[in-house]
């Protein structure tokens, strides 16, 4: 039930609603009700373009959105990490599908906890390797197709300013989460 998930005996330390950035505030509220016992993995919109301007406008809620979602991010929490961009992977039948950043990060967090302690950042080429996606990018809003991108250093720098964690490709390492910021 809605109340049962808030009980102390429910043991979890990570929460996410993959593909639903509009539920970030609900996850923050749930975590607050549980005395901040979890890390909230937040998604950016699947259609958010990979430019510094688009990412910063969304993260700063430049469109004055009233709630989290396609138009902007309104929530913040010391327990919230927001990640960008989305990923490309395959489903069980081998077809390519687009997945939100939280899909990649939940696995990366679990892998990190297997090789290090949970308080170590799941970031960088040692503990931040993303092994459940083949590319990163976004869905082009005009064509409806996945657009593969490389999150360049300048875009990563602008993401850092607004506390959005970049997932990018590095030669010799593959796809890597390269951030450990909370919003």
What are these regions (language model features)?
Residues 1-183:
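A glycine- and small-residue-enriched flexible loop/hinge signal that marks low-structured segments
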């Amino acid at each position: 039930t809605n109340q049962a998930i808030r009980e102390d005996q429910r043991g979890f330390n990570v929460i996410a609603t993959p593909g639903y950035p509009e539920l970030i505030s609900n996850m923050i509220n749930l975590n607050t009700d549980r005395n901040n016992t979890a890390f909230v993995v937040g998604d950016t919109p699947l259609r958010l373009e990979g430019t510094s301007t688009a990412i910063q406008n969304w993260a700063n809620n430049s469109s004055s959105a009233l709630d989290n979602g396609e138009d902007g991010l309104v929530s913040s929490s010391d327990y919230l990490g927001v990640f960008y961009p989305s990923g490309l992977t395959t489903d069980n039948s081998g077809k390519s599908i687009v997945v939100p950043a939280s899909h990649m990060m939940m696995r990366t967090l679990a892998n990190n906890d297997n090789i290090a302690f949970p308080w170590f950042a799941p970031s960088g080429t040692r503990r931040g390797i993303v092994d459940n996606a083949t590319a990163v990018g976004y869905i082009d809003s005009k064509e409806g197709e996945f657009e593969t991108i490389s999150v360049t250093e300048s875009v990563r720098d602008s993401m850092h300013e607004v506390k959005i964690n970049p997932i990018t490709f590095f030669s010799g390492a593959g796809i890597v989460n390269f951030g450990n910021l909370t919003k």
